[in-house]
Amino acid sequence: MSERKLFTSESVSEGHPDKIADQISDAILDAILAEDPDAHVAAETAVYTGSVHVFGEISTTAYVDINRVVRDTIAEIGYTKGEYGFSAESVGVHPSLVEQSPDIAQGVNEALETRQDASQDPLDLIGAGDQGLMFGFAVDETPELMPLPISLSHKLVRRLAELRKSGEIAYLRPDAKSQVTVEYDEDNQPVRVDTVVISTQHDPEVSQEQIRQDVIERVIKEIIPAHYLDDQTNYFINPTGRFVIGGPQGDSGLTGRKIIVDTYGGYSRHGGGAFSGKDATKVDRSASYAARYIAKNIVAAGLAKKAEVQLAYAIGVAHPVSVRIDTFGTSTVAESKLEAAVRHIFDLRPAGIIQMLDLKRPIYKQTAAYGHMGRTDIDLPWEKLDKVEALKTAVL
């Protein structure tokens, strides 16, 4: 019998406590960038019953009404009723934002290449906002070149939110989680969905039988292609039996606690840095986007079926200290050729990434729920496939 393997990824809805925090942090970032594209922002958020704390470091000429941004974000998510234990108008908002450390700022505003080597290249001016390593990934399992388990997991919780916000399923509340287990064949191709887990917050009067029927028929079967489902697929719908208390009333939330949900669902390695609330001088964010951009174009060019790109930086230095590409034995050319082509085509200095992907714009709040990578519902610059021909030519 051929060997088959299972892989599982999860996602969470926009109403999950950690995702509320991410969205608030990115809403603040967007509000600042709309007035001051050169701002340096590191905005962290903590949420719990009846309270939001916003803290971190910001250098900007902009004035932003933090209180209003927080409340508008919470209302947009759907926390508008007192019985949720967390509502837009009654929540306490406690901002505590300070100026960015001058020790960090001197390395970001004037990179080592400019200070030490007197470089005149304007793209050498910005140094990395911190040391670190970042990964980007792509695989040919889905049209958006993402792993199937995380792709399906995101789409399931997005569908729940659509049904809730449209009023089609009126008993749904904002907090929800999904988890999808996919079975792979001996060639590492996805063949079926083995297990689907969905937990969704709900009003107290609805029966679990009704929730199960609605979730299977109106969420799972509308999102997961029928050829992946069979009579052996397991469905766990609200397996605790009740999920009325949710959101920040049920659990506290913090910015940056869903980094695997934000990326590839554990299918690829992760450098550990979170995204939300950070401007593009923070390579945790911008270099992760650049690495995804590279990996996606490599796979789209047919140069590999699967590609993982690692970038690494030193704080205050513009050029990356390393670039590595791993195609897991699927490349059609030597990986050394791919690395040389990537270094030639993509400017991986922070200022180069910012320019290449136009990252000084207020585009970040929309990424703070349902994944930063592989999005088909919004237009993100790191998802473009405009380097395919350049890569094909460069490896000849």
UniProtKB/Swiss-Prot annotation:
Q: Name one GO biological process term.
A: one-carbon metabolic process
Which residues participate in Mg(2+) binding? 18
Location in or out of the cell: Cytoplasm
Looking up SUPFAM superfamilies in the UniProt record yields: S-adenosylmethionine synthetase
Cellular component GO terms, alphabetical:
cytoplasm
Provide the residue positions that the database annotates as binding K(+): 44
Provide the alphabetized UniProt keywords.
ATP-binding, Cytoplasm, Magnesium, Metal-binding, Nucleotide-binding, One-carbon metabolism, Potassium, Transferase
Q: Which residues cross the membrane?
A: none
The EC number(s) attached to this protein equal: 2.5.1.6
Q: Which domain of life is it from?
A: Bacteria
Chain residues that bind ATP: 16, 175-177, 242-243, 251, 257-258, 274, 278
Which cofactors must be present for this protein to function? Mg(2+); K(+)
Major location category of this protein: cytoplasm
Quaternary arrangement and interactors, per the entry?
Answer: Homotetramer; dimer of dimers.
Q: Which family does it belong to?
A: Belongs to the AdoMet synthase family.
Task: Report the protein name in the record.
Answer: S-adenosylmethionine synthase
Q: Which gene encodes it?
A: metK
